[in-house]
Amino acid sequence: MHRRTTTSISVTAFTLLLGATSVWAQANVSPDLTAALSTGSRSGNNSNSGDGSSSGTSTVDIVVQYKTAPTSAEYQTVTSLGGTLVTQYGAVKAAHYSVPKSAVQTLAANPNIAYMSLNRPVKGMLNITAATVHSNIAKSQYGLDGTGIGIAVIDSGIVSSLKDFGSRIVYSQNFIGSNATDQFGHGTHVAGILGANLPGGTYIGIAPNANLINLRVLDQNGASTDSAVIAAIDTAIQLSYTWKYNVRVINLSLGRPVFEPAAYDPLCQAVEQAWRAGIVVVVAAGNEGRDNSVGENGYGTINSPGNDPYVITVGAMKTEGTTTRTDDLIASYSSKGPTLYDHYVKPDLVAPGNLVVSTLPPGLTLSNQYPKNTVSGNYFTLSGTSMATPVVSGAAALLLQKNPKWTPDQVKARLMATATKNFPTSSIAVDATTGVSYVSYYDTYTVGAGYLDIQAAITGTQVASGSAVSPYINFNTTTGALSVSNVAGANVIWGSNVIWGSNAIWGSNVIWGSNVIWGSNVIWGSNVIWGSNVIWGSNVIWGSSVASPDLILDAEK
């Protein structure tokens, strides 16, 4: 688990934080890149990396976002400054460069550059599941199995030789190693939750006849970079225009800490581009829900790009080993909102993610390191929001099979509106390894709009007509009141005129701790578990530069 410290979002305060060191700063340059210009830590795509600057050299590995598509002249400018174009994207208006530190200030003066940041490290976030969310009924009663829908699995690759996938891995591309075959195990496990379909098999995926697009970005240790993930998203967008692949869903069971508002985060901007292209993007919330490093009890720990308001961000539930839903509880490690900087209400919903059995054959990094997690043969148990995410991606594929003309917003709204909203006030989980107990409260920052119910989503009749971007929270430091606000300029469906009722999205009885009930204006109780200066004040939580693997191998009791 990574540790976080507090720092200001402002450039001025960030400069002061560095003490006597003289640091040039500009609004379109990320604070961590500004700091790297004077520190000389290691490159973001080096095996020992912590950020995007080369130790002992004068170069930095960066991702540059442009306001309009970069031209050949802009690429040539980088070359003339001694830099190298590493990755040129197509649908995403960005580029990955390795440049001398001395060139950054010159590049930042280009009015077409929206934002420059380090090429940051990214890592993966680490049957009963299908029955719990009623996906088995989708096939038996409604004939829905994901047929014709392409799901892009941006992960550690897929072991395509497994019979569980048949011939449904229709495209493979590698963005980090020598080939697209999984060496870590995470991607194959995720793909199995999505679409495993071994004839006569026990472990069947949520959308067992969907086509899988295998885009490998995580190496044998589950590590990657922003640039690799952006390249994979860019490829998925371009493949979506080809009927052969029909990419309608992107699954991102990975992420990293949040460094800036979503409007500047390169991962967030890439997933928004996919969303605008008509692709439903489903992202893991993260597994930092137990983090109390700055006294916030796991709140404010949503990872990037799950902090983006457009995407569907997924938290993890525990099925308690049964197919009934009434005994299911939140996994205490599931990251909680609101998001850093923007204060978006996240996660959007929760799904089963604890002790999930799926495909993961012997001989891969995870199966070698944790042999006790092997169930039998090619099946393995993992827990985390990584495992909950493909459950929702599979659900999205089923909805799109039934409603092929639906937009990503309509899919997101239907899944949220029909999610189960009946929860206990709180629950206690015990870590199976350490024996430490964790208390979870079932507020909107923990469970979002509720617990995924695929049957309810399929049979629902509500169809959203506006944007389904997640709203953000305003905190009045004088009155202590919270209020939900829509994203500026968006025709958002969450307002008081929601077509299925003002309380249907999150429900009317979601409890904040023991004394605060959600509504349009709720009171910030005096015993709130984090101080106002941590999330809401001028000091915001700052994620560490090295992300820990969001993968829970020892699940909760």
Q: What annotation goes with each model-predicted range?
A:
Residues 64, 78, 97, 107, ...:
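Residue-level detector of buried hydrophobic side-chain packing
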